[in-house]
């Protein structure tokens, strides 16, 4: 997993703190205060790895990872209700956020200070959003069961409702751009095949429904090599699905706890999980074994961020 000095895991949760860990040792190297009125809903590191963005109830914060400062360096103004997701465009030029105010926002990160430059209205609280690897389309999932695909350049969008009376909890697009996944509060994960021709907006073709869990699905994510899809749940499990036929390959269990978030390593062989017992874990997927615990949070961990690179390919 890359240069060990660069292997930084970030976690946040209900104890209003964000912790930064050396992934290879389990040592906590920095603790940053979030806001006292909110848990951490999502974390993402800037592409240059120097800063960490966090979002929660009526707040978006940006922290400096290279200094000893534990306070945010930027507070984003004018955010209403719960901010549920965020992420960065690959060059770091803009950031997207999604929230329960029904909006997905594009923030210009080159401007000083950063400001909101575009808004998409989903007409319902937005639980999830992710960026297509083409860097122009954003997938979104809302509480009324809608899945949107928004082309930021052309302003075109497509809307699909895969299941009535269900809330979309997370969305993910495979790094190779072939699949879109949307997971809901009934334990189902829907897959669409994505196709794009002549630089036009991607089209969605229904692929399958995976009855993945008995309870809420909290997160779905594809592995960097696009060969695996994970789903995490309130049933205490992480299920790993092979994307060649979407059969279940592995199941990891943290009994009696919700698994709120997870992240693959760059080589797709390792997995980090965040759960309601306040522990982040590193798993070796081949053996389904938990090999390291990251302990220090006093309440549930609800978000994590990990990005490394394959060295010496």
Swiss-Prot record:
Which positions does the entry assign to WD repeats? 1-33, 35-73, 78-117, 121-160, 163-202, 212-251, 254-293, 296-313
GO BP annotations of the record are:
positive regulation of cell size; positive regulation of insulin receptor signaling pathway; positive regulation of phosphatidylinositol 3-kinase/protein kinase B signal transduction; positive regulation of transcription by transcription factor localization; protein localization to nucleus; regulation of actin cytoskeleton organization; TOR signaling; TORC2 signaling
Per the record, its GO cellular-component terms are:
cytoplasm; TORC2 complex
Keyword terms of this UniProt record: Cytoplasm, Repeat, WD repeat
Q: Does the keyword Cytoplasm apply?
A: yes
Q: Indicate where this protein is primarily found.
A: cytoplasm
Which family is this sequence assigned to?
A: Belongs to the WD repeat LST8 family.
Q: How does it assemble?
A: Part of a minimal complex, TORC1, consisting of mTor, raptor and lst8. Interacts with mTor but not raptor. Does not require raptor for binding to mTor. Part of a minimal complex, TORC2, consisting of mTor, rictor and lst8.
Q: Which PANTHER family match?
A: G BETA-LIKE PROTEIN GBL, TARGET OF RAPAMYCIN COMPLEX SUBUNIT LST8
Function statement: Subunit of TORC1 and TORC2, which regulate cell growth and survival in response to nutrient and hormonal signals. Essential for TORC2-mediated regulation of cell growth and phosphorylation of Akt1. However it is not required for TORC1-mediated functions such as TORC1-dependent regulation of cell growth, autophagy and phosphorylation of S6K.
Protein name in the entry: Protein LST8 homolog
The major lineage groups are:
Eukaryota, Metazoa, Ecdysozoa, Arthropoda, Hexapoda
What gene does this protein come from? Lst8
């Amino acid at each position: 997993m890359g240069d060990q000095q660069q292997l930084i895991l970030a976690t946040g949760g209900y104890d209003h703190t964000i912790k930064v860990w050396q992934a290879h040792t389990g040592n906590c190297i920095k603790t940053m205060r979030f806001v006292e009125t909110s848990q951490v809903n999502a974390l993402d590191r800037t592409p240059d790895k120097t800063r960490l963005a966090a979002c929660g109830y009526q707040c978006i914060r940006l922290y400096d990872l290279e200094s000893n400062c534990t306070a945010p360096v930027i507070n984003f103004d004018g955010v209403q209700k719960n901010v549920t997701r965020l992420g960065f465009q690959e060059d770091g030029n803009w950031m997207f956020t999604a929230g329960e105010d029904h909006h997905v926002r594009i923030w210009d990160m080159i401007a000083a200070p950063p400001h909101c430059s575009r808004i998409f209205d989903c007409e319902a609280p937005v639980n999830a959003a992710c960026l297509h690897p083409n860097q122009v389309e954003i997938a979104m999932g809302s509480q009324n069961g809608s899945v949107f695909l928004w082309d930021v350049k052309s302003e075109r969008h497509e809307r699909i409702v895969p299941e009535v009376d269900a809330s979309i909890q997370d969305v993910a697009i495979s790094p190779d751009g072939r699949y879109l996944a949307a997971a809901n509060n009934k334990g189902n994960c829907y897959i669409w095949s994505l196709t794009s021709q002549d630089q036009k907006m991607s089209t969605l073709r229904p692929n399958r429904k995976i009855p993945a869990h008995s309870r809420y699905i909290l997160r779905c994510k594809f592995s960097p090599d696009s060969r695996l899809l994970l789903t995490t749940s309130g049933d205490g499990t992480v299920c790993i699905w092979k994307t060649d036929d979407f059969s279940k390959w592995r199941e990891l269990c943290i009994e009696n706890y919700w698994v709120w978030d997870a992240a693959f390593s760059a080589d797709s062989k390792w997995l980090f999980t965040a759960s309601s017992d306040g522990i982040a874990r590193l798993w070796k997927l081949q053996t389904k074994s938990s090999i390291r615990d990251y302990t220090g949070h006093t309440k549930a961990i609800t978000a994590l961020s990990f990005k490394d690179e394959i060295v010496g390919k």
